[in-house]
Amino acid sequence: MSEQEEIIAVRRAPRFSPNSVDRDDAILRAVCEELQQRMSLTANIPVIDEDDFAKAPAKAKVYVTMARSEAALQTLTRKTEEGALCINSAMGVRQCQRVLLTELMRYYHIPMPAEEGKNGTWLKRGDAAAQSKGDVVFCPDHEALLKAIIGFTKRGINEYVTSAHVEGDLVKFYGVGRRFFRYYYPTDDGFSKFGDEQRNGAARHYPFDEDALRKDAFRLAELTGATAYGGDAIVDDRGQYFFIDFNDWPSFSRCRGEAAKAIAAEVMELYHEALK
């Protein structure tokens, strides 16, 4: 097998990277640069758009992929069955879809909000990650929730989840397997994908059990099968935390350099294990 067929990167389609196309592209390229050095490759690792990959899948031993489309995931499933290593795997991406994720979290008792709450309720698209601001809607009361559900139905979105709004600090975390974990308060630096983070206001930095949060994130990553992952949690004024989101391969924008090294290390370790 030629060097070009050793490893291929699959870029996420822009529709799955709302307001984050450049950041998603940056982390994928950073990982490719790390892998190129670690594998002593003379040529750059090819980067293919996921839609092109689904139509004409190139052959490789390893696919480093941020793809989310069903067509691309079906292709990755076939590649896995043929013996290739895919990170993230198709299974890991699918298990991060909100309907499946919510069932998984509830079954394994991962801390999460109730379905509705007195301080409002979030309605979230359940069949895929948010592709636009309208895929996640805050509803101040039950009547607003019913109207929002009707709005989803009119858009052809029939799978959704609801989550009680929890007052407290919003914490955004990033992880790679069990080797890497970082968390940040997004309101501290002001970056927001859709602006929803501002509803909780400035972080008060309530004390909480950071080790427990990390262990629950690791556990959820293993339950879903996502190698590179991230998510959001709310920490209330009593120090209790609740997971409100969990995603396959985020942009890692707040810790890109560290994350790229961790992802590359994880890929290399899993690759060598697969060769045994």
Q: For each of these PLM feature ranges, what is it?
A:
Residues 2-10:
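Extreme N-terminal starter segment of soluble prokaryotic enzymes
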Residues 12-114, 129:
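Conserved N-proximal alpha/beta basic substrate-recognition cap immediately N-terminal to
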Residues 60-64, 124, 173-175, 239-254:
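A short beta-strand motif that forms the metal-chelation/ATP-contact edge
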Residues 121, 181, 229, 242-245:
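Protein kinase-like catalytic core scaffold
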Residues 121-147, 151:
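Conserved anion/nucleotide-ligand pocket segment
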Residues 121-122, 158-162, 228-231:
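A short linear hydrophobic-aromatic micro-motif
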Residues 139-224:
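Phosphate-binding site of ATP-dependent enzymes
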Residues 194-243, 255, 262-275:
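A long amphipathic alpha-helix within ATP-dependent nucleotide-binding catalytic cores
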